[in-house]
UniProtKB/Swiss-Prot annotation:
Pfam families the UniProt entry points to: Arrestin_C, Arrestin_N
GO terms, biological process: extracellular vesicle biogenesis; positive regulation of interferon-beta production; positive regulation of ubiquitin-protein transferase activity; protein K63-linked ubiquitination; protein transport; protein ubiquitination
Subunit structure: Interacts with ADRB2. Interacts (via PPxY motifs) with ITCH, NEDD4L and WWP2. Interacts with AVPR2. Identified in a complex containing at least ARRDC4, AVPR2 and HGS. Interacts with SLC11A2; controls the incorporation of SLC11A2 into extracellular vesicles through an ubiquitination-dependent mechanism. Interacts with TRIM65.
Record PANTHER family: ARRESTIN DOMAIN CONTAINING PROTEIN, ARRESTIN DOMAIN-CONTAINING PROTEIN 4
Keywords, alphabetical: Cell membrane, Cytoplasmic vesicle, Endosome, Membrane, Repeat
Role summary: Functions as an adapter recruiting ubiquitin-protein ligases to their specific substrates. Plays a role in endocytosis of activated G protein-coupled receptors (GPCRs). Through an ubiquitination-dependent mechanism also plays a role in the incorporation of SLC11A2 into extracellular vesicles. May play a role in glucose uptake. Participates in innate immune response by promoting IFIH1/MDA5 activation through interaction with TRIM65.
GO molecular function, one term: ubiquitin-like ligase-substrate adaptor activity
Protein's organism: Homo sapiens (Human)
Any one annotated GO CC term: cytoplasm
Name of the protein in question: Arrestin domain-containing protein 4
């Protein structure tokens, strides 16, 4: 973890503890993965002799999804029952760093600086990638707690970034994706002709910073002037108490040239670069982060013609061979810029006269997911690890729009599993 070490000022009754801090062994390490060792020191500085009962270290990790009245500080007891909440635990470690000998109640630390080393191993089972969203989060932290007689406990906490690696070199993510669709422009007997669209990407899995080559063929047999466009969309889905919340937003886009009536256009690898975004999260039973590449055509006075191609944002880059020994790729250094950067909203270019007609909203749909196994009280088994360079850098600075604003849809039980 980069950055300054965690530090907490003393609040003891006599001010004997000047500071309590926590540092990791490798402060430059951006993130941790399943099975790795976390090591460091707890630092304590005392100005006078300090009596303590124990010094312990706690490491915790959990996913939570919640919304409703009780998530607001001003919620009353009568409205608290309306809130929805779900939680899944992934990490729970507790270590004793210092405790009194058997038969003794306290330890006396002499004035000065003290260091207490710690070391523990993360579970070998896949951990879900760290993430923070509007209706939930997946967070891991390490906390040192100093227990003292007659005064409140003192503690210091550090956040631990975790990534569940997704290798885009797996066969499923190397498969090309192709879709075709046609739309008749006009209505009833006043049709002006069809508009057809075919779009293809060479593989399903990409990583942050990669440029996706888009291959498309557009034929305009209508009387309208049309505009082809492409965009990457992120969809966050939260599940709590059998209800769902979904947020969908554009994270990158590109636009093509106008296509006149009776003309065609071809994209021979038109590129769309993936900005720093959190990797796909597909192995958590209460929070899911999906991506799709939409290739669509704006038709004045009509609904868009749109193709959505599934996309997985991974963490282990494409090696060009689809090698079976893809574990070697995990040794590659990753661009972790999404841990700190905020992604600006990327507006489309100013509209021309063909765009003046107001565009209807994209149809929003979440594929139905069958009911997953019961996750209460146990770690969810990862279904399909797919992920690259990330922390949820807080999701990009986009305009958050909840596509399900009413409570009606929330009452429908929905679950997801790959």
């Amino acid at each position: 973890m980069g950055g300054e070490a965690g530090c907490a000022a003393a609040v003891g009754a006599e001010g004997r503890v000047k500071s309590l801090g926590l540092v990791f062994e490798d402060e430059r390490k951006g993130c941790y993965s399943s099975g790795e060792t976390v090591a460091g020191h707890v630092l304590l500085e005392a100005s006078e002799p300090v009596a303590l009962r124990a010094l312990r270290l706690e490491a915790q990790g959990r996913a939570t999804a919640a919304w409703g009245p009780s998530t607001c500080p001003r919620a009353s007891a009568s409205t608290a029952a309306l809130a929805v909440f779900s939680e899944v635990e992934y990490l729970n470690v507790r270590l004793s760093l210092r405790e009194p000998p058997a038969g003794e109640g306290i330890i006396l630390l002499q004035p000065g600086k003290h260091e207490f080393p710690f070391r523990f191993q993360l579970p070998s089972e896949p951990l879900v990638t760290s993430f923070t969203g509007k209706y939930g989060s997946i967070q891991y932290c390490v906390r040192a707690v100093l227990e003292r007689p007659k005064v409140p406990d003192q503690s210091v906490k550090r956040e631990l970034q975790v990534v569940s690696h997704v290798d885009v070199n797996t066969p499923a993510l190397l498969t090309p994706v192709l879709k075709t669709q046609e739309k008749m422009v006009g209505c009833w007997f006043f049709t002006s002709g069809p508009v057809s669209l075919s779009a293809k990407i060479e593989r399903k899995g990409y990583c942050n910073g990669e440029a996706i080559p888009i291959y498309a063929e557009i034929e305009n047999c209508s009387s309208r002037l049309i505009v082809p466009k492409a965009a990457i969309f992120q969809t966050q889905t939260y599940l709590a108490s059998g209800k769902t919340k979904t947020i969908r937003h554009m994270v990158a886009n590109v636009r093509g040239n106008h296509i006149a009536s009776g003309s065609t256009d071809t994209w021979n690898g038109k590129t769309l670069k993936i900005p720093p975004v959190t990797p796909s999260i597909l192995d958590c039973c209460i929070i899911r982060v999906d991506y799709s590449l939409a290739v669509y055509i704006h038709i004045p006075g009509a609904k868009k013609l749109m193709l959505e191609l599934p996309l997985v944002i991974g963490t282990i880059p494409y090696n060009g061979f689809g090698s079976r020994n893809s574990s070697i790729a995990s040794q590659f250094s990753m661009d972790m810029s999404w841990l700190t950067l905020t992604l600006p909203e990327q507006p489309e270019a100013p509209p021309n006269y063909a765009d003046v007609v107001s565009e209807e909203e994209f149809s929003r749909h979440i594929p139905p997911y069958p009911q997953p196994p019961n996750c209460e009280g146990e770690v969810c088994c990862p279904v399909f690890a797919c992920i690259q360079e990330f922390r949820f850098q807080p999701p990009p600075l986009y305009s958050e729009v909840d596509p399900h604003p009413s409570d009606v849809e929330e009452s429908q039980p929905v679950s997801f599993i790959l």
